[in-house]
């Protein structure tokens, strides 16, 4: 019992976490358009539901026809209460999400996160043949299971010249990548303020919400430059 209590207090340091990525809109659209059938199609569609709603697996995997509705003004939305925090959220439905929901008569497929995590990597690996950005590598950390496998000689992971573990982007995608992707892409639209975005994701803490925005330093620099150019075109000069 004492050991269990001690173990429950252990927290994974940020430096020990696997790399957390997001899929951009082009990658998501390519995934949406990818010809698939059977279980693979269901896994793809369930993952995209998570991306388009910005929700956790526990919520986007449990949606039923009752959750798909409209506002009093006719806006198509997904209305439910988040399981983890008991927070009511009302994400809007984009065209892709609506078509996915219609495909299943608004009863989203029920798939375990274990199956989703296994299949989505294989699906994205195949998609990388036509979407090369999925073949970019990221420095990451191995899980305990992966470290044990490597120590036993069962597998050997790629490493860069500094000895750091690297993985292809498609191999870093999990069920929770859907939520990070949705939130990051929502942020990149520049259409919504923090309050509006947090109302969609269900976050109550702005600091935690911002941790979901997974932009690289280069992406942030590009975003700043784009805003500067817009400002210059509007006649505002001399900012830098």
Give short role names for the model-derived ranges.
Residues 1-5, 50-74, 194-195:
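Short, charged phosphate-coordinating catalytic segments
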Residues 9-12, 62-100:
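Conserved tyrosine-mediated DNA breakage-rejoining catalytic core shared by Y-recombinases
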Residues 226-240:
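C-terminal secondary-structure termini that scaffold catalytic or DNA-interacting sites
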Residues 67-74, 172, 191-212:
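Short, polar N-cap/turn motifs at the start of nucleic acid-interacting alpha helices
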Residues 2-57, 114-115:
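Basic, Lys/Arg- and aromatic-enriched nucleic-acid-binding interface segment
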Residues 22, 84-86, 200-226:
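Catalytic-site neighborhood detector that most strongly recognizes the C-terminal catalytic loop/helix
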Residues 106-107, 121-199:
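Short, basic (Lys/Arg/His-rich) helix/loop patches that form interaction surfaces
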